Amino acid sequence: MMAHHSMDDRDSPDKGFDSGKYVRYTPEQVEALERVYAECPKPSSLRRQQLIRECPILCNIEPRQIKVWFQNRRCREKQRKESARLQTVNRKLSAMNKLLMEENDRLQKQVSNLVYENGFMKHRIHTASGTTTDNSCESVVVSGQQRQQQNPTHQHPQRDVNNPANLLSIAEETLAEFLCKATGTAVDWVQMIGMKPGPDSIGIVAVSRNCSGIAARACGLVSLEPMKVAEILKDRPSWFRDCRCVETLNVIPTGNGGTIELVNTQIYAPTTLAAARDFWTLRYSTSLEDGSYVVCERSLTSATGGPNGPLSSSFVRAKMLSSGFLIRPCDGGGSIIHIVDHVDLDVSSVPEVLRPLYESSKILAQKMTVAALRHVRQIAQETSGEVQYSGGRQPAVLRTFSQRLCRGFNDAVNGFVDDGWSPMSSDGGEDITIMINSSSAKFAGSQYGSSFLPSFGSGVLCAKASMLLQNVPPLVLIRFLREHRAEWADYGVDAYSAASLRATPYAVPCVRTGGFPSNQVILPLAQTLEHEEFLEVVRLGGHAYSPEDMGLSRDMYLLQLCSGVDENVVGGCAQLVFAPIDESFADDAPLLPSGFRVIPLDQKTNPNDHQSASRTRDLASSLDGSTKTDSETNSRLVLTIAFQFTFDNHSRDNVATMARQYVRNVVGSIQRVALAITPRPGSMQLPTSPEALTLVRWITRSYSIHTGADLFGADSQSCGGDTLLKQLWDHSDAILCCSLKTNASPVFTFANQAGLDMLETTLVALQDIMLDKTLDDSGRRALCSEFAKIMQQGYANLPAGICVSSMGRPVSYEQATVWKVVDDNESNHCLAFTLVSWSFV
């Protein structure tokens, strides 16, 4: 059959083609054209002419016809890709529609149960009030307990641990309970805000309400086959960053083709102030009659029966209630995943101030349930080739770097004895904990690599601390630490860490309050689909490693992982972890991670909650305090800091002294940063002193005198002092005052709320900020050129420009007005600025 292509050939001089008819190509001609198309889909005019000369079989076809053939071929290819994309989207929507219909059925059952329970409780209350006047409330309590018995803890007789049939009985019970949670109404699920279903969304995410322990549930669609999904999810350390290890102690095949495993799972503690957790569980994997594959898991206890698991003094035994994942195949490929995590983390063993962290289903959802679903979706995208990373590295290699950074940081925070960590005597202060590790066995089999000790000396020293911060936005704090390293880091300490990668690291530096400024350049490597985590290389350049090499300036490199910075995430933690690397950046490069972790604590309305006396303070010291205040208006978070350094035997004490002082300096820097970025409600920060009222009156009156206009409109003339002050304080434009002295650099003396937000400071710290440090070069030149006019005419308008906040962030503004503020005696008091429509760049 002859291949053909449509085109109008009325203008063709070739009589071999009929005008207005289809131009037909022989199979040989099509094959020749396809070969060229595979090499170059859009050949130039010269290339098309060359093609006709090189291929005799195309000699009877005009160049214009060849051009049209390539145009149509590109169009068909585009249509084919679009058709395939639409078919994929249609399959996703069909699967998601099926998922939503099932979720709707489950919700209808849940509503029916709630209606029945509501009627039952009303009947019991009515019966109790009509038949007795007993004030013991026993009958009411009994009815109230009906709701609490949604998730009863079944008491099972002690089973023979050596009989596989008894373990299968436990497994089948676990499976039934898990399926009721995953697709039924065994748990009262509440959908998390911001989690909306769709073809490209993470899926449906819900958390538990009124059940024992904490629980989270997620369901979503991925383009992987069920068995591949099961393989990924069973490898918990690959996607759950807090998982230290999963050890399978026994594997028992079942008669129905399934598998029973006895598993010991160890979980890192997120902070330095609580012990790590472990689980002793039975894990059951099997196929269902409808073709689905399920992996469910539950703790083995005296209540459930089963063998006893290994115990470790470094871990607190937590309880896993029936959990797991259900994987169902989709028509046309892919899978629908239902994931349930239900645990009891034994909050009684946790300091009270940290208990919200262990009682939050939202945190569980983000750290485990959603993390699992995101990881599977990430693998699916990489498998399909939709994710492209720069630098020539495979996605799996970059994921391994991220895992090693997190694992190394978690090892440092936890400092397990069986890893070789041991505490070092303190200097009398309890704020910084120093631990050392000289175990060669530890490093030989760890993420550091077998060459760790030869490269890094005799061992590793870790300095760590935890702090309680109040009313500090976690994302803002982590972003600042990432973007403004020079504000908290010491260049000499960074250089020492980087020099540990060399054969002869130089002497231990003395910590300075302010190190050399360094040029920080962030080079992105990879990021996850939802952009909640990204891996990057940070280049710090400009200085020598040692005083002896001052002439040999050398760049330093850090491999850095920033996670949890998605503003739409509810209940998640954010962290910044980094490790020095050399220029080669090999795939097996040894990593010694340090960094920060910020975990928000849910707000509590219990007046007995322990509170910190100041905005930022050491968390450990607050545990023994007795100050108790209402925390309804306070948001709290825990900041954990850990820095690791290498040492030789002769330098251990010096490194410990340096590390302790360095971490204390970092803590002090973070306290200053936290003070500056803490949101301040305008009504609570509004200054109401007589001096403030007088200054505002001078500012507005001077503006009116010099410009002939009113600062806040015509109505402001009749306003009283308090009203005028509130208008200035709440004004959207930044209004600032600075000193007017000829013998000293001008400093800011007053600012409204917008001005404080723009400068990222407070009224107290404002007076330490100089005007010339805030304006950029063009702004300073513009002000100097207009200064004489300001002093003579009273005001001047400046063009749009850039200024810098106290945190080093650039701020743009569309226009600035500067005027001279005079007091009641017509004497010059200060200069006032209004920066219109300012925003962070």
Curated annotation (Swiss-Prot):
GO terms for cellular component: nucleus. Residues 160-388 form the START domain. Residues 18-81 bind DNA. Residues 603-614 have a biased composition (Polar residues). Changing residue 55 to A: No effect on DNA-binding. Keywords: Coiled coil, Differentiation, DNA-binding, Homeobox, Nucleus, Transcription, Transcription regulation. Changing residue 75 to A: Decrease in DNA-binding efficiency. Gene3D superfamilies: 3.30.530.20, Homeodomain-like (1.10.10.60). PROSITE patterns: HOMEOBOX_2, START. Residues 1-18 have a biased composition (Basic and acidic residues). It is found in: Nucleus. Residues 85-118 form a coiled coil. Its main location: nucleus. Changing residue 59 to A: No effect on DNA-binding. Induction: By auxin. Repressed by miR165 and miR166. Probable transcription factor involved in the determination of adaxial-abaxial polarity in ovule primordium. Specifies adaxial leaf fates. Binds to the DNA sequence 5'-GTAAT[GC]ATTAC-3'. Belongs to the HD-ZIP homeobox family. Class III subfamily. This is Homeobox-leucine zipper protein ATHB-9. It comes from Arabidopsis thaliana. The lineage of its organism: Eukaryota, Viridiplantae, Streptophyta, Embryophyta, Tracheophyta.
